[in-house]
């Protein structure tokens, strides 16, 4: 079950990293192997919009929108844990695995953003602040996700002023 939880969290990181939106993430539409399956109304983000879903039947509630996929992955892992509980009668180890999903996703998403932004060696706290600010800004400007991150790779280090990503201890 731990492997299923890890693979699901890793899959959600991969989807989010590239802007993939599954569209229908019911428990029967996710693989315990961490594979993308049964993606009927799937799509790819163009403008960075965490609220976007390609599923027109989900347009009202937007349960399966881009920005909600990690939470739905967690929900699905917890549903599997509930089903396994009926077989083992010991909820504690199952709950610990369900709880580990969020940390696994958070660490993977942090690594993915650090890679995309070229900030792998930056101070972790400051790097997360920069990434969070960027993710807040991108939807405001209707920025094409793929083009934006691809263009970052074209910037030469010597073309930009040095940015201090260390934590300011004076505040």
Regions picked out by a protein language model, each given a short descriptive name:
Residues 1-22, 33-124, 128-129, 133:
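ATP-dependent phospho-/nucleotidyl transfer catalytic cores
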Residues 27-28, 32:
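Catalytic-loop Lys-Pro-X-Asn motif of eukaryotic-like protein kinases
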Residues 107, 111, 132-171:
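C-terminal, non-catalytic "cap/extension" segments appended to globular domains
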């Amino acid at each position: 079950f731990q492997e299923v939880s890890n693979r699901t969290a890793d899959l959600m990181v991969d989807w989010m990293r590239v802007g993939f939106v599954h569209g229908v993430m019911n428990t029967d539409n996710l693989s315990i192997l961490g594979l993308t399956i049964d993606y009927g109304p799937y799509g790819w983000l163009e403008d960075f919009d965490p609220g976007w879903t390609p599923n027109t039947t989900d347009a009202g509630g937007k349960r399966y929108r881009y920005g909600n996929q990690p939470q739905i992955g967690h929900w699905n892992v917890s549903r599997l844990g509930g089903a396994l509980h009926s077989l083992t009668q010991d909820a504690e180890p199952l709950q610990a695995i369900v709880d580990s999903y969020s940390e696994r996703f958070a660490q993977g998403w942090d690594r993915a953003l650090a890679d995309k932004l070229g900030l792998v060696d930056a101070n972790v706290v400051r790097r997360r602040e920069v990434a969070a600010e960027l993710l807040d800004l991108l939807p405001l400007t209707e920025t094409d996700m793929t083009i934006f991150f691809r263009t970052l790779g074209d910037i030469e280090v010597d073309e930009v002023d040095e940015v201090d990503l260390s934590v300011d201890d004076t505040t």
